[in-house]
């Protein structure tokens, strides 16, 4: 609470660019940076290890009334639940609308350039691993990508 209380005074002593560098250094995003689908990476997964992932549809409302969308993959070891991934991504991509589709697990082995996609999410159901594999293959073209419907 002390930090929140002191924030106006702290901000007044920092110039805006220094504050943005500080936020970026601590892995925070300013929401106004994510105002269009073109600025959203299709794949953001941890560089190694075994972790949960989800597929998410991201929508952008345009003046014509249509809602263009993209499907993205997100997976992080730091998230214990698939819903934690969704909550983090939704906050980061605001004001874009997000819709969780389903989830699973990823085993990422960078030494051998292999990614294995498998399992399901108890909360969101089993993701279409073919869609996930296609997105990941585009981001990691030199990797061998495998999928399985086995395991949790």
What is the meaning of each model-derived region?
Residues 2-152:
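Intrinsic low-complexity, intrinsically disordered or marginally ordered coil/linker segments
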